[in-house]
């Protein structure tokens, strides 16, 4: 596995958010951390990064949590795993390994957005005693999502990119033109939002 460089964009002095590193589940993870207290593990979605949580982290810290937002495997500055494994089950194992490495206990909370939501569901299913609360946003549990695909054409339209990424063409398209595809997704999904801070 290799650590990939990233331009760290947060002004740590202004936010009380710091960048840390830990090795868990055979991968080196960089993560943002704010506050002390019970662990609140924040799993980002796609095309987001851990910086997505920068506005929520100080609020969680003020509520008595140690908010930790890892850059998920393959997202700079975390490592790119040599096995290329990004399945939900592996991401769930990452979350439980991070829980252990970061000193989590049975009062810990896990929050996942988008791609991070199935990972947090999986982590809770694999090790329910680790998590007091599980919060999934923007993506329902797998069975409900499957039913939505069967019953709701609009959901299939909104989820086109999930199917696109299953094809080898995605590797070519996503990296082309300095990742213009990712910028296009940001413009489409969040009109008017300046995503340069998050990329």
Which residues fall in each region the model found?
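Flexible "cap/lid" subdomain of the alpha/beta-hydrolase fold that forms the substrate-access gate
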Residues: 2-20, 28-29, 68, 75-111, ...
């Amino acid at each position: 596995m290799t650590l990939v460089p990233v331009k760290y964009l947060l002004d740590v002095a202004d936010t009380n958010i710091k960048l840390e590193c830990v090795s868990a589940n055979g991968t080196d993870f960089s993560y943002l951390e704010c506050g002390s207290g019970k662990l609140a593990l924040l799993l980002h979605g796609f095309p987001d990064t851990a910086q997505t949580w920068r506005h929520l982290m100080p609020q969680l810290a003020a509520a008595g949590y140690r908010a930790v937002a890892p850059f998920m495997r393959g997202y700079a500055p975390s490592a790119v795993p040599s096995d290329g494994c990004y399945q939900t089950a592996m991401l769930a194992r990452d979350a439980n390994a991070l829980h252990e490495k970061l000193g989590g206990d049975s009062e810990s909370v896990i929050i996942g957005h988008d791609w991070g939501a199935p990972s947090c569901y999986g982590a809770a299913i694999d090790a329910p005693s680790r998590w007091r609360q599980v919060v999934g946003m923007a993506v329902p549990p797998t069975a409900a999502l499957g039913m939505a695909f069967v019953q709701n054409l609009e959901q299939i339209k909104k989820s086109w990119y999930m199917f696109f990424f299953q094809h080898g063409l995605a590797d070519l398209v996503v990296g082309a033109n300095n990742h213009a595809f990712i910028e296009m997704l940001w413009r489409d999904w969040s009109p008017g939002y300046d995503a340069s801070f998050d990329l």
